[in-house]
Amino acid sequence: MIFVTVGNHFQGFERLLEKVDEIAPRLSHEIVVQRGYSKYVPKNTNHFDFVPANTAMEYIRNADLVISHAGMGTLILCKEYGIPIIIFPRREKFKEHVNDHQMEIAQVLEKREDPNIHIVYEENQLEEKIMEAVGRREIAPLENRGRENLVRTITEFIKTCHG
């Protein structure tokens, strides 16, 4: 199963949802989409607006691949569970976010060259990246050390972003 999540930001992310819906018939995996506040309603995928956090975590845990905005919560869960993730950052110029901090996050992640983290900046790159990433787990899941592990991961990432 491929799980697509756009998070809970108040601006929609139509660009991602429309592209996923377009390529869904060509993929062999079931696709489940969390739409958030997006207005676009997919025709070729299962979808919902929001679910409780524990339900979203289960979707991520059971996914062969996650496609997401550059949200830290989703990224950390994918790292913890060893799930490949495609990051498709929201862009200010498309009115998907109030600034381009997600582009900055994606650029930092791209430099880390983690084989389970794939970065896509343009819609036309998405299908090829899905084919490369689906079912690919090159890194064992991180040990779950609870809150301390989460805090350490976030702290290390922030230090990386700000030099």
Predicted regions and their residues:
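Nucleotide-activated sugar donor-binding and catalytic core shared by glycosyltransferases
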Residues: 1-163
